[in-house]
């Protein structure tokens, strides 16, 4: 299988392209969070359902050659590598420094009278550090929903409320799987608050809104993409374990024009240490907040994972010996705040189922739509991915 870094970049970009078909404004989500949830589902699926989910973790080239050997045993052996990567990644993340908070938490809420296979529960604990909490969906669906929502709220510093809205959980719900990513980090070099000024952010050539524009001049990892007429800048957090990358086109309306010229592989290449160089940069970055929620079943089905959500096709025989289990809901909510001190970001996935320019400095003036993502540098995994286009 591909590395978690490559997979999270690919899923992040593919999912972004799907979401932007129906979202004109800001977009923000956690590729690693969504992948973790898919991994936990994959652990309990078999047959064609498992094969579809497994394709997410392989490049197209790999997938074509592996389709020939879709024997059940081999699929299970193959997927073990996927789960081991998550185990390693989640263990690494849990050991990170005290300079910021980064928590990835998984939990299963299961109907207390429904029998889940012990083997599944053991594996999901082993690989994903997730335990099963029995709840009474049959007699107390709404209380159970509120209980799950308050758990998510407590784990995201109260940034994500009501992950599961009214009516999303019923007495027939058997299992709710929740993944939660919370990050609060400080920049390696904070922006001085006294340099933050009100400025216009251009959503397009004729429409602007006021933003609080933060400014600093320093050395940053930088690359100019000549053929795209765009710049990429890496802004490190304390200790350099994590960085935010910003991809800013030169033109106000340049982002839409270049999206189709960007691929996940190119994003990895452009932001690799060998490709970027340290340059003196005048950076102007808006202070911003984005909060977003998505119902992902249709989006993931469009990306080839439809069987997991189909009552008639889903095969969850690795999770339960009972029949009829399938994922009814795949909800994902996320929040990010970017300030002078740093970034606060959270995401939860639920399956219910003015500085004057000095000579020689590069100017990166983020006063029009840009892409941004937050990456764990050691594993190259994309924790969060977004587009900021509307203050």
From Swiss-Prot:
Pfam families assigned: Serpin (PF00079)
InterPro entries with a match to the protein in the record: Serpin_CS, Serpin_dom, Serpin_fam, Serpin_sf, Serpin_sf_1, Serpin_sf_2
Q: Which GO terms describe its biological process?
A: negative regulation of endopeptidase activity; negative regulation of keratinocyte apoptotic process; regulation of proteolysis; response to UV
CDD domains found in the cross-reference section = serpinB13_headpin
Homology family:
Belongs to the serpin family. Ov-serpin subfamily.
Q: What PROSITE patterns would the database entry show?
A: SERPIN (PS00284)
Q: Which domain of life is it from?
A: Eukaryota
Q: Where is this site: Reactive bond?
A: 356-357
A GO molecular function term, named singly, is: protease binding
Q: Which UniProt keywords apply?
A: Cytoplasm, Protease inhibitor, Serine protease inhibitor
Q: What is this protein called?
A: Serpin B13
Task: Name the residues that span the membrane.
Answer: none
Q: In which tissues is it expressed?
A: Skin specific.
Taking the first listed entry, what is the main subcellular location of this protein, grouped into a coarse class? cytoplasm
Question: Which GO CC annotations does the UniProt entry carry?
Answer: cytoplasm; cytosol; extracellular exosome; extracellular space; lysosomal lumen; nuclear speck; nucleoplasm
Cell compartment(s), UniProt: Cytoplasm
PANTHER family named among the record's database cross-references? SERINE PROTEASE INHIBITOR, SERPIN, SERPIN B13
- Purpose of the protein: May play a role in the proliferation or differentiation of keratinocytes.
What gene is this protein a product of? SERPINB13
């Amino acid at each position: 299988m591909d590395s978690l870094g490559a997979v999270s970049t690919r899923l992040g970009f593919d999912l972004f392209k799907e979401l932007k078909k129906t979202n004109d404004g800001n977009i923000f989500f956690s590729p690693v969070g969504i992948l973790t949830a898919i991994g936990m589902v994959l652990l309990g699926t078999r047959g064609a359902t498992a094969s579809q989910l497994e394709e997410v973790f392989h490049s197209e080239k790999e997938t074509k050659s592996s389709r020939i050997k879709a024997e059940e045993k081999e699929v299970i052996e193959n997927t073990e590598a996927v789960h081991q990567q998550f185990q390693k990644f989640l263990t690494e993340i849990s050991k990170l420094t005290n300079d910021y908070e980064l928590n990835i938490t998984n939990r299963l809420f299961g109907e207390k009278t429904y029998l889940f296979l012990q083997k599944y529960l053991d594996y999901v604990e082993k690989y994903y550090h997730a335990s099963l909490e029995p709840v009474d969906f049959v007699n107390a669906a709404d209380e159970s929903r509120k209980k799950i929502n308050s758990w998510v709220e407590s784990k995201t510093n109260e940034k994500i409320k009501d992950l599961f809205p009214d009516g999303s959980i019923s007495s027939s719900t058997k299992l709710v799987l929740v993944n939660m990513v919370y990050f609060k980090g400080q920049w390696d070099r904070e922006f001085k608050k006294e340099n933050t000024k009100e400025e216009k952010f251009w959503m397009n050539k004729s429409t602007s809104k006021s933003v609080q524009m933060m400014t600093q001049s320093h050395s940053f990892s930088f690359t100019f993409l000549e053929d795209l007429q765009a710049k990429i800048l890496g802004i490190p957090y304390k200790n350099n374990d994590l960085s935010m990358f910003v991809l800013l086109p030169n033109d106000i309306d340049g982002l839409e024009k270049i999206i189709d010229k960007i691929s996940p592989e190119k994003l990895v290449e452009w932001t690799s240490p060998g490709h970027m160089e340290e340059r003196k940069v005048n950076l102007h970055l808006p202070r911003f907040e984005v909060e977003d929620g998505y119902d992902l079943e249709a989006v993931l089905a469009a990306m080839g994972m439809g069987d997991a959500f189909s009552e008639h096709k889903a095969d969850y025989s690795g999770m339960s010996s009972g029949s009829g289990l399938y994922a009814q809901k795949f909800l994902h909510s996320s929040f990010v705040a970017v300030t002078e001190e740093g970034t606060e970001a959270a995401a939860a996935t639920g399956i219910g189922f003015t500085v004057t320019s000095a000579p020689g400095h590069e100017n990166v003036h983020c006063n029009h739509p840009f892409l941004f993502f937050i990456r764990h540098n050691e594993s190259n995994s994309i924790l969060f991915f977004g587009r900021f286009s509307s203050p």
